[in-house]
A protein has these predicted regions:
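A transmembrane-helix-recognition feature enriched in membrane-embedded lipid enzymes
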Residues: 1-47, 51, 66-86
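Membrane-interface alpha-helices at helix entry/exit sites of multi-pass transporters
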Residues: 59-63
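Active-site pocket-lining segments that scaffold enzyme catalytic pockets across diverse folds
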Residues: 116
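Histidine-anchored nucleotide/phosphate-binding helix
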Residues: 120-130
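Short internal beta-strands
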Residues: 137-142
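Short, flexible loop segments at boundaries between secondary-structure elements
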Residues: 145-146
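Conserved small/polar residues in nucleotide/adenosyl-binding loops
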Residues: 150-152
Length: 152
């Protein structure tokens, strides 16, 4: 239960904090992610990046580390979701091809959107919902049942 309140409090802080503090927090969280990630996981990530992108080992390691550093920014962005509305989400997300969703939705058969687990994909669901489309996301339950109470 404590974790739930800590996350909610952190979310509130990130919602009221000035941009410079949010950027600092994101940088610190990203740095912690780099240091806290086990070496074997970083090596596996770099190997996968190297294979998929065809880059050399040094570049793959650089991309893996940059991805972890970006994680801090993503956490701060997610903590600010309570502030999102249809008007301001367009400053964060550039929507292209919404007409295809509209066309599929008008067929009244439902629409399934599959996405990869990269970047701040949580913004996709928020963006679509704020454009008036009903959303249902399928995710794994959190290990901490109280954290499952937090809806993004």
């Amino acid at each position: 239960m404590l974790a739930y309140y800590v996350v909610k409090f952190f979310s509130w802080i990130m919602c009221v904090a000035p941009k410079c503090l949010r950027n600092l927090t994101a940088a610190i969280l990203g740095g912690i992610a780099v240091v806290a990630t086990p070496k074997w996981r970083m090596q596996m990530a770099a190997a996968n990046i190297q294979e998929c992108l065809g880059v050399d080992k040094a570049r793959a390691q650089q991309i893996a580390e940059k991805s972890l550093r970006r994680f801090g920014r993503m956490v701060v962005e997610v903590m600010r979701f309570p502030l999102l509305n249809k008007d301001n989400i367009t400053k964060l997300v550039n929507v292209e091809g919404l007409e295809y969703l509209e066309e599929a939705y008008k067929q009244n058969k439902g629409v399934i959107i599959a996405t990869g687990h990269f970047g701040n994909w949580e913004l996709l669901g928020a963006t679509i919902a704020l454009h008036g489309y009903p959303m249902l996301s399928i995710t794994r339950k959190q290990n901490n049942k109280y954290l499952s109470l937090i809806h993004i």
